[in-house]
UniProtKB/Swiss-Prot annotation:
<dbReference type="GO" id="GO:0005886">
    <property type="term" value="C:plasma membrane"/>
</dbReference>
<comment type="subunit">
    <text>Heterodimer of a large membrane-associated beta subunit and a small pyruvoyl-containing alpha subunit.</text>
</comment>
<comment type="pathway">
    <text>Phospholipid metabolism; phosphatidylethanolamine biosynthesis; phosphatidylethanolamine from CDP-diacylglycerol: step 2/2.</text>
</comment>
<dbReference type="InterPro" id="IPR033177">
    <property type="entry name" value="PSD-B"/>
</dbReference>
<keyword id="KW-0456">Lyase</keyword>
<keyword id="KW-1003">Cell membrane</keyword>
<keyword id="KW-0444">Lipid biosynthesis</keyword>
<keyword id="KW-0210">Decarboxylase</keyword>
<dbReference type="Pfam" id="PF02666">
    <property type="entry name" value="PS_Dcarbxylase"/>
</dbReference>
<keyword id="KW-0472">Membrane</keyword>
<keyword id="KW-1208">Phospholipid metabolism</keyword>
<feature type="modified residue" description="Pyruvic acid (Ser); by autocatalysis">
    <location>
        <position position="255"/>
    </location>
</feature>
<feature type="active site" description="Schiff-base intermediate with substrate; via pyruvic acid; for decarboxylase activity">
    <location>
        <position position="255"/>
    </location>
</feature>
<feature type="active site" description="Charge relay system; for autoendoproteolytic cleavage activity">
    <location>
        <position position="149"/>
    </location>
</feature>
<dbReference type="InterPro" id="IPR003817">
    <property type="entry name" value="PS_Dcarbxylase"/>
</dbReference>
<feature type="active site" description="Charge relay system; for autoendoproteolytic cleavage activity">
    <location>
        <position position="255"/>
    </location>
</feature>
<dbReference type="GO" id="GO:0004609">
    <property type="term" value="F:phosphatidylserine decarboxylase activity"/>
</dbReference>
Length: 292
């Protein structure tokens, strides 16, 4: 590892990541007038963001940085291409890793893997349906669209908030910080779907000021020191049904989504591999036919 990379990793270990993230969160939520506008325009230039994709193309339309960062895209630019027998990509981003969950372990990077059970909050019963299943880890860069959508129809079964650290989740950190996605703060959503159980894990990171869902609003902050979970009815008027392509959550500043599926439920698109660019709505996987 290059000396500069070692320095970057060292500073991640020692800097007050939660404090920095919350301070940035306060700024991102503030209506700071000309300063907010200046920062938004700098961000657009720095990360080469194509504002023609946004419903509100003008930076002036956004009164806070958070409003800009969670901007909605024109629906016609992210059509739902996945058919009834396919799963759609949930986000714009890039594949970090994907493949089989082996003996309850998920591959992170060369020399590093982590526990499925830890990722989902430590409950063995929550992890059991996904043992020997499939996973996909997708990294959202600062330039990306930061709303998360459903890869298939689903009914929300459980949500879990897992407190943790706030390391960066960029490729350098993923390659050098063990257990990264199972040690960072995260929100786990477990669904019953047409392909069986599915989890969507929204992983926090340095300067991620907020993680939210469409059914509960902002989950974090505030943060807590203990795991919290909420169970939901899967039938009746109170059940939370979300359709394929429908929004399920968002990040205020970028991070990572980890998806898990049961054994023999899906087969990923052959073209997908680490660093593959993903676009919400495009085909991610095929639903495997049941042997029944």
């Amino acid at each position: 590892m290059a000396k500069t990379d070692k320095v970057k990793i060292f500073f991640q270990h020692v800097m007050p990541k939660h404090l920095i993230s919350r301070l940035i969160g306060k700024f991102a939520a503030a209506r700071a007038g000309w300063f907010t506008q200046l920062f938004i325009r700098w961000f657009i230039r720095q990360y080469k963001i194509d504002m023609s994709e946004a419903i509100e193309e003008s930076p002036k339309a956004y009164k806070t940085f958070n409003a800009f960062f969670t901007r909605h895209l024109k629906p016609e630019l992210r059509p739902l291409e996945a058919s009834e027998s396919e799963l759609a990509h949930p986000v714009d981003g890039a594949v970090s890793q994907l493949g089989d969950i082996e003996n309850g372990r998920i591959f992170q990077a060369k020399g590093h893997d982590y526990s499925l059970q830890e990722l989902l909050g430590g409950n063995e019963e929550d992890a059991k349906p996904f043992v020997d299943g499939k996973f996909a880890t997708i990294y959202l860069a600062p330039k990306d669209y930061h709303r998360i959508h459903m890869p298939c129809d689903g009914v929300l079964k459980k949500m879990i908030y897992v407190p943790g650290d706030l390391y960066s989740v960029n490729p350098l950190t993923a390659a050098n910080v063990p257990n990264l996605f199972a040690r960072n703060e995260r929100v786990v959503a477990i669904f019953d779907t047409e392909v069986g159980p599915m989890s969507l894990v929204l992983v926090g990171a340095t300067i991620v000021a907020s993680i939210g869902t469409v059914w509960s609003g902002t989950i974090t902050p505030p943060t807590g020191g203990r795991i919290q979970s909420w169970s939901y009815p899967t039938s009746g008027h109170s059940a939370i049904h979300l359709k394929k392509g429908e929004e399920m959550g968002h990040f205020k500043l970028g991070s990572t989504v980890v998806l898990t599926f049961a054994k023999d439920a899906i087969e990923f698109n052959d073209e997908l591999k680490p660093l593959s660019v993903t676009r919400m709505g495009e085909v991610m996987a095929e639903i495997k036919e049941s042997d029944d």
